[in-house]
């Protein structure tokens, strides 16, 4: 009798959509999604009707028309006769460049400041506190303008490098830091360069493979392999041998002062440098607080136990504290990376042409296709934001709680053998 009652109870009924907690949340989510789709369909229909009444229609054919404007900082070939589509691609690459470099630099600044803020040295800790409080409490746009103004005011112009007694000199005859930007050597790829690049990629893979092997060896046998110098050898030796064996297939083109400016090499304009530095140091102040909170979330007994076993402070921080703090640090770090990407849209304030300046600026004004341009901008930032979030969430799942067990296992195995 009880079995038949349970069977009737488990049999699906429509009333369970609201009364059963197993289905209630899905029901509400379905209705919310349905209402959202209906609202978007209504707004879209209303938009199309209004555009038709005004004699307008949504079309992306303007992307194939000549842009008619130049872009000073670009990673691919482009001129004023290129299409608006290519101009948009240049803007996309410029946005991705400053976002990628900004995430790396902000992480470095944030982790360094977060660790130093917990330093026993009173002066260092207070200096890091001042850095954090000043930079995170002033809008990023103001920092972009201040840093760009300082960049223009204090760095020499190219003419200062001219003459028998120049006011400024190049660093190692290869690097020039001017108010117009940084000039650095440019690699020139000749015959056989693909082999060198392929060897370099294999060397990187080899380093990760060796470190993975060393980690597995440590976990399974408790044997600690020397990884630092071995990794350096795997990284450099094969590439250097192939490079000289093929007769220097990759050379460098150095910047040279010709006329009123430098020619040759890679020119990173001042707008890119100032934007990148401002975004990095501003976001780094927020990351520093997250890193500090993550470190403080680890029980003090962990560091005390590691110190009692004779581990040095830098090893305690790198092998015990930080791996456990990552599970607290990484989730908010995702938001900071997204903020760097979206804050890069302020690039137009210093003349850096990102996607907002090309597609959302000049292209929009020239073609009058505001709706199409804004929709493309929204799609771009949505895709980039979701991609960053997905990648960081995968990494976050890979280090959740596991790292704590791994670190404890390493310590136990290492000192149990001694």
Name what the model sees in each region.
Residues 2-418:
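Transmembrane alpha-helices and adjacent helix-loop boundaries
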